[in-house]
Amino acid sequence: MNPVVVVHGGGASNISKDRKERVRQGILRAATVGYNILKQGGSAVDAVEGAVTVLEDDPDFNAGCGSVLNENGEVEMDASIMNGKDLSAGAVSAVRCIANPIKLARLVMDKTPHCFLTDQGAARFAAANGIPTIPGQQLVTERSRKRLEKEKLEKDAQKPDCQKNLGTVGAVALDCQGNLAYATSTGGIVNKMPGRVGDTPCVGSGGYADNDIGAVSTTGHGESILKVNLARLALFHVEQGKSLEEAANASLGHMKSKVKGVGGIIMVNKAGEWAVKWTSTSMPWAAAKDGKLHSGIDFGDTSIIDLS
């Protein structure tokens, strides 16, 4: 089985010119890390965790050290991961003072009988398992501060925009043994209420993986994704015989027509076919397969380079 990894850097209304190349390079790094793990015999779960960790460590993405701020100016993060081999899953929400929530979600999957831990329970579990904590302000970037200030001003001016605040990062993978996995991580939406949880940590919404069907990671307006169970909906369409592209388009179209939500999907199936689709203005993505690295940000913007 030829391994495949696909990553995304979140749906976006726009990416400024000064950030676009940094975002592209970040996505390429994440896909390359995930692909190298697979080529060295690592599992799909290892690959998606590794790829998402790269993006959590990159301040240009809304996850980990680049997370947006809640209305109190604090970082609260969500993440989830799933193994398509046995449907085991791990998720965390509203976690603070941790650089890599996806690593904590992996531990929930591997070391507890549960699927989901939140807030103080997640924090105590992290401490008990040696996950290092960092000062909360160390996760706050100047860009995040400015975004919060701008959002508060626009909220006061009553200028809602369903395309804003869509950032999430995610990965899906197929390993050499034919196993599938997904991982998704986010800082949520700018100026959210403390304790708000979106789609990202919710299995079936923020992602899903089943060796018999495929793996999905989603991005977009979290409340909209939750209402339609976007990830599992996409795989339902695959089960009904649709191609990955048809399934992604149908699911995103349903979300847009039912709740006016926009977002994006990355998918890979058990045959190693992959797809990326979005209805937001842009979505940074990269896919590695057969020694080739495909990537793009905007509609019609696709490049392919050799991995050597």
From Swiss-Prot:
GO molecular function, one term: asparaginase activity
One of the GO BP terms on file: asparagine catabolic process via L-aspartate
Modified residues (N-acetylmethionine): 1
GO CC terms, sorted: cytoplasm; photoreceptor inner segment
Active site: 168 (nucleophile)
Enzyme Commission number(s) from the entry: 3.4.19.5, 3.5.1.1
Subcellular location: Cytoplasm
Chemical reaction(s) catalysed: L-asparagine + H2O = L-aspartate + NH4(+); Cleavage of a beta-linked Asp residue from the N-terminus of a polypeptide
Binding site for substrate: 196-199, 219-222
Cited function: Has both L-asparaginase and beta-aspartyl peptidase activity. May be involved in the production of L-aspartate, which can act as an excitatory neurotransmitter in some brain regions. Is highly active with L-Asp beta-methyl ester. Besides, has catalytic activity toward beta-aspartyl dipeptides and their methyl esters, including beta-L-Asp-L-Phe, beta-L-Asp-L-Phe methyl ester (aspartame), beta-L-Asp-L-Ala, beta-L-Asp-L-Leu and beta-L-Asp-L-Lys. Does not have aspartylglucosaminidase activity and is inactive toward GlcNAc-L-Asn. Likewise, has no activity toward glutamine.
Protein name according to UniProt: Isoaspartyl peptidase/L-asparaginase
